[in-house]
């Protein structure tokens, strides 16, 4: 009988004997390898012995609760060694069978204990290998620390590819030199039309309509475009595109209409040679009327395209090819897409109110139109001797954003700024030189009586005729118009007030209202920003900003309805509270002007009395009754 680590093995034959011997041999070999290893420390041996003791205790607890089974196991082992060849009777055989079963169960527990022992040893080996790896890492760190150190110095850098990109950017800026070197023109310069060498019929047409002298913007444009046209008769590639920044009402339409008609008056075969793009239908009518006036006694044909007419009807009219087309961008793109217009002979492209057109897509008009213009490939020789499309860009608030202007694909552009102050900013905002601007500031608590303040102000300043009032929306314009009508009636004044917004913007209605306003049948007209740009009435002397504009651009186009064609005009802006006053102060800083904005030295009580407030309350009740009754 042999005993290893508290485990007894019997010499008696058993079917599980082979398994027991293999387990015993594995256990002994593991112990021998562990004891023979010189690298293991004393702590590792103690850990192993503790693991073996735990294994013994677990084995003993599993064989029985009283320890009797262990004694039986020992007795069985002794009997197996001493009396292996004899039997003492049937009772001893049965006892022996029972003992054999118990031995088998004990052996299975031994195998389980051995597997647990292996897992413990496996974890121990893993821990040792991790410790060795950590030691090797620390050794490598010590080796690195032995490397000599040097002072910090900048690392050498390779040649960067961005250097080429910087060169390209510099070249691009060089192409924008025209933005940095504009041509400035005085706002007061005037020259007789007869001194420009115009045809006799053109001078006659101008004089018959009351135009004897050219204003500053017209002088500047004619001085550049007329020589270009003479040079192009010999070298069509000479000249370049033109951008003009001039105040609203300065006469830009005449500035581009005169040279275009002078250039085309001797044409032989009708072709589409000039296209004028404007943002609104009212401007279409005004521009077409100007071209029709100047083209009298010529064979030139002028056609307008607008969205309130059937596109099929316009296509029928276009079969008789016109020389000049006036259109909105969206309607022009429709005809181009349907193949109704051929641009092969196009010479002039005019973009009026360019700031508004470039800010809106209109069926992606700019890209579509430029691609159609560039779709006719020509050789280098043709580029020299064939006239290219000359682009003429006009606006009172002309952008200098290169990103927006690049969409126009400008060629050799020149910039004219009609302004006595020689300055260039990202947005060129200019008001007429003859315009006087005023600000009426009151406390925010008085805003509830805003219509009453306006009525009393117009009465006190004698602004009851030729006055244009701007409101922020259709609803605001309708309400203000009705309240002013009621207030003037209560105050016993015969003042006619009307309104114009998108709710009554039909061509016939609009034309009648504007005609009555120009003839002073309508004394005060309340409008919105959407409608304002189409109003070109020289008799307007007063503009009232009842509601503040949203931007400097809107402000310029509002106040530009007066002081047109070098006439005098006044603009008043109503500010209620510190917030509105601060906003207006910041807004007007971005606008170029000849004179500063003045304050109106009048308080609320200077304008409105207690009796006036009572009358205003009566008007409010009357307006409420009319709304409920649908009057």
From Swiss-Prot:
EC number, UniProt record: 3.6.4.13
Chain's role: ATP-binding RNA helicase involved in the biogenesis of 60S ribosomal subunits and is required for the normal formation of 25S and 5.8S rRNAs.
Annotated source species: Meyerozyma guilliermondii (strain ATCC 6260 / CBS 566 / DSM 6381 / JCM 1539 / NBRC 10279 / NRRL Y-324) (Yeast)
Protein name: ATP-dependent RNA helicase DBP6
Acidic residues: compositionally biased ranges: 24-41
Gene3D superfamilies found in the cross-reference section: P-loop containing nucleotide triphosphate hydrolases (3.40.50.300)
Molecular-function GO term, any one: RNA helicase activity
Pfam families: DEAD, Helicase_C
PROSITE patterns in the cross-refs: DEAD_ATP_HELICASE (PS00039), HELICASE_ATP_BIND_1 (PS51192), HELICASE_CTER (PS51194), Q_MOTIF (PS51195)
Renumbered residue ranges of the record's region Disordered: 1-161
InterPro entries associated with the record: DEAD/DEAH_box_helicase_dom, Helicase_ATP-bd, Helicase_C-like, P-loop_NTPase, RNA-helicase_DEAD-box_CS
UniProt family annotation: Belongs to the DEAD box helicase family. DDX51/DBP6 subfamily.
Top-level taxon: Eukaryota
Gene name for this UniProt entry: DBP6
This protein's record includes keyword Metal-binding: no
Domain comment quoted from the record: The Q motif is unique to and characteristic of the DEAD box family of RNA helicases and controls ATP binding and hydrolysis.
GO BP annotation list: maturation of 5.8S rRNA from tricistronic rRNA transcript (SSU-rRNA, 5.8S rRNA, LSU-rRNA); maturation of LSU-rRNA from tricistronic rRNA transcript (SSU-rRNA, 5.8S rRNA, LSU-rRNA)
